[in-house]
């Protein structure tokens, strides 16, 4: 979609999916992208990867739900490793390059007596944004690292 307030919020309005189904929402721009707590996620229109996944991971024990955010961070790290060295993880869910944040993950789970009822897994990856204006302390994009823009769809 071109624009959403937040891809996580968009998926919150959907019904649960089957155990083997993942619903993905991708936006070119988020008017109210969120991070952990009260933090916002700054992103210029059409510059970064902004997506969320809705799943019902009943196979993940509630006590191990942190594994979902770790798996997401590892997947982003592996994708970025193909472009540059120095990509590291700040557990449980942030991806850094030389102490600068290039990606963040926001996991929102619903749990009932049987386990994890649903999970919305939001990821923001700074791809082509060259300037950041928020009060985020240390953002960086892949384009800043490489010195040129890259195709978001390839990442």
Please tell me what each predicted stretch does.
Residues 1-82, 149:
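N-terminal lobe of the biotin/lipoate ligase/transferase fold
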Residues 27, 87-91:
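General beta-strand structural signal in soluble alpha/beta enzymes
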Residues 58-63, 67-87, 97-155:
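Long, positively charged amphipathic alpha-helical accessory segments at protein N-termini or as interdomain linkers
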């Amino acid at each position: 979609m071109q624009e959403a307030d937040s891809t996580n919020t968009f998926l919150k309005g959907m019904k649960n999916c089957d155990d083997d189904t993942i619903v993905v929402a991708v936006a070119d721009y988020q008017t109210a992208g969120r991070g952990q707590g009260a933090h916002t996620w700054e992103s210029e229109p059409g510059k970064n990867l902004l997506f969320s996944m809705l799943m019902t991971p009943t196979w993940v024990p509630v006590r191990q739900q942190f594994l979902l955010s770790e798996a997401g961070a590892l997947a982003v790290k592996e994708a970025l490793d193909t472009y540059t060295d120095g990509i590291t993880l700040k557990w449980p869910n942030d991806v850094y390059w030389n102490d600068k944040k290039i990606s963040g993950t926001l996991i929102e789970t619903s749990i009932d007596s049987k386990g994890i009822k649903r999970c919305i897994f939001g990821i923001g990856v700074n791809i082509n944004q060259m300037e950041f204006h928020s009060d985020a302390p240390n953002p960086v994009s892949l384009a800043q690292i490489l010195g040129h823009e890259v195709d978001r769809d390839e990442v």
